[in-house]
UniProtKB/Swiss-Prot annotation:
Changing residue 599 to A: Severe hydroxyurea (HU) sensitivity. Interacts with cds1. This is Mediator of replication checkpoint protein 1. GO terms for biological process: mitotic DNA replication checkpoint signaling; mitotic DNA replication initiation; mitotic G2 DNA damage checkpoint signaling; mitotic intra-S DNA damage checkpoint signaling; replication fork arrest at mating type locus; replication fork arrest at rDNA repeats; replication fork arrest at tRNA locus.
Amino acid sequence: MASLDENADELHRMDSSDEASINDDQEDILDTPRTRVRKMLASVDMQLSSNAVSEASLDKESTVGNLENQKNRSYSSEIYLHSDTNFLSNFDSAYERVRRLLNQQGGKSSLQKKEVEQIETQEGGDNAKGSPSSENKDSDRNSRLQQLIEKKRNALKKEQEDLIQNSATSHSKSDNLDSESADDSDLADESELSKKYTSDRKIRNASKKALLELHRNTARLTRETALKPEVVVKKKVTLREFFQKIGFKNDNQLENKAISEEEANSTEPPNVEKEEPKPSVDRSTGIVNSEDIKELSVEDDSLELKEITPEALDIGQTSLFTTLNQTQVKKEDNKKFLLKEINAKLNEDDIDSELEIEVKPKTTALDNIEKSKLSEENEHGIKGKLKQLAEIKLSKDGKPFENEFNIKSFNRNLVKRAAVMAKLQRNQLEEELKAKGIYKPTIQGEKEEEEDPLERARNDAEKIRQLEKASGNASDEGELNDEEEVISSSNTPSTKAKTTNKVIISDVIIEATQAEPKRRQKNSRVVFDEEDLTGDSHGSSNMKISESDDESNGDMIRDSFDRLSSESIKDSQKTEELHDSFGINDEVDQSTSLYVQNSQPSASQLTIVDATYSQPPPRWESSSRDDKTNTSSTQPSQVDSLVPTQLDSTIPTQIDSVQRNKDQDDEEILEERRESRRDSKTFLSRTMLYNKDTGKADSAWASDLIEEQAIESDDEYAGIGGLSDDGLSDSDAELEVQNMIDDETTIQKGEVASMAQFAKDQEMDRDEKLVKQLMKDVTTGALRKRNRNGFAALDDSDDEDYSNLRREKLKELRRQKLLEDGNLNVLEGDKRKAFLATVEDSLVSSKDNLTWLDATVEDSGVGSSDLGDEYLYSEQSLNHEEEEQMEEELSEIFSSGGPNVVDRVYLKKSSTRHTSDNNSLEEVLPIFPGVRKLVSNSQSEKIGDLSNDNSMGAKSYKTPIISSTQRPQGRKFRGLMNQSSKADISRTVDAGSIKVVPNSQSANPPRLLASLNNYSDFD
């Protein structure tokens, strides 16, 4: 019975637990996934904390037995097994804990389902056998309950064992690999269980929040691991090994330094004693031997620091200098480094209360090295290096060559370099000009000039003009200037005339350097022959030069080149100086003129002057000329049309005989100049005359060509311009032209003056009217109101706007006059709409077209404004009954007018009553013009026949028609008002109101258009 009671209690407990689980499941359905996870974790933590001890002691013996069977199990793993659940619950992440719990629950539920299925199958089998008795049923129930309880307990025990084994195996893997073989069976069971769990339960996908939390945890773990990196030292490198690799110090020095460092780092610093011998110090390095350092000792209580040795201050300099100067520096054993005395002084001066540190000044190994005398070999080596830097060639013995410096080769090299530089500059300039489209090669330019004779003639004329200008600016000797001209050729005219007066230094130098230097040189003179002059009309005179063997020619060419380079910058010299270089000036001697002539290129060929050309001696007669010439020294060269690097031809004239012969007397200089002048006359005049004749022939040919072209052009247009000029003389043609041209006007001077006076008078009248109108507008306030919208700003278009405004006013007046006609009923109908529109929209250009608008006395008070026209009148005897009657009649008109008519009579009701009571304000009655087809003659007469008993007399009033845009307030009318025959109405301003005062005097009624000029105040 007791067992039955226990079974019943257990069943009741299970039922209650099932109900609680059902309720919990219902609550879990309503909860969010996050709250479910929190609840599960809280329940698991509570169970683990409460049952930790009982679960640990439940199967202690079995776990201990299993642990003994395992090999190489450490004590730390045993301790971990007792607290595995706590460790897992506290240190695992939330994701791992939830997954583990879900797996456990899934495993339990699957086991329970299997047990229930087995029981049902057994019951089904028992039922199939037959229906047992009641006692058998009770016994069967008890047995089933016991079996279920035992199975449950066994399952729980097995789960606990599995957890313990899993934790043990996970930790034992890192300690021992043999433990894995012992737990193969347990792992196999675990894998089978996990397979069952996964097959029975479907894994739910993690939510976004769970994934986000998982990523955060992983990021936190990675940050923590990154903050604590693991430092691994692969290999330690000592200072000695480092210096050995770079080969900086010897092994002995490194050993001594290592020992000194050990002593410095030791706890007991060395002490200094005066009685002991001085330690030996290596003079080259300044390092104290280790044995001597060990002997030093210092008291334990002293705070004195170790002496800072020169080695500590030296950063590798001592060893560097010692290795470089080992061969030159001699070691001296007598000099030693007194380390003990320095340390002793530091100890004596030390004070117990304060710490004083004295640092020895920095010294280097150079202070300890004595300067040794340089040997002759070293001295000779230094001199050799200096000579090598100066680019002085040395022989094998180290001595320079006998010919240290050759002036001829030096000058030749200098000239070559200058020629190359000039050539490069010229090429660069040619490329720039080609890129701009200005430069044309010589061959191309010649072809174009041959094809275009007009261009060629123009160039020839330009040359002639240049020559004439140069001849006019020459010196006082007229005969010489008339005969001598610039050497030029006619077969290759340049595209620019200025190029004929320039010297191409680069071509001269390049071709001068091409001469053979070893050839024996002779004195040369340029000789012109008649055959050379007359042989080729278009060819240039080939100058022949013979070489001289004077050794002083290098000095002359060097001096001339220096002068060329110094004077090349002066570009502002006039062109007249160009002709002084050709012998035109009297002060140029024979040799200078010859040198300049040889350096001056012709139009087609350039005659070469050798760089070794020497100056002819003074008093050199023409009889000593050598007709034998060396033709090999002349080399023709084509001259380009554009010369980039050009120097003024006046530069060679600086080589004057006075500068070259400073030691000579004045008489010799004058005599030499006379001879040179005589030679230049006989030498250059023939050439110049020949060139002058050829230039005249070219100019004559060009003029003939131009005349032929002009005749051809006249023939093309023959017969078009009337009679030909062949039958008329020059005088007849001039008379005819004079008759065609009339320089004087046919109008007489009096007529012109009268016309000018008339125009002037008109202009004066117009200006006077404008000024008067402006003054009137200023006095009446019209100018202020006119510029009201422009904020009192002056504008050029004010007058134009004002004229447009007056035009609109006239247009409105015309429309009102048309509406007053009684025959407007004829114009009713759709057929007349176009006509009415044209009448209404037509513009009135001037008031001359409105003469028919002139009104009588009845039209007094009609005005115009920018918002429309207004009809102003006043009645002193108008009572309220007449006013009401008139309002009723007007209301009938407005009611029949349609939606376009707006009744504003009632807006003015209060103002009209006020004016009728006071009898002081003018009354304004607005009637809109949109009802023109409804206003008939009878209605207008009915409305207009308003009588005035007092002052106005028996008088008929027209219908006051006012613009629809007029404001309902009272208008201020400052224009000229029409007056009746009995009374003259004038305006006076009294306290802001307008009074109408009758006058006994009568005046002629003004015309309507005249009154429009006085309308200046329009709101």
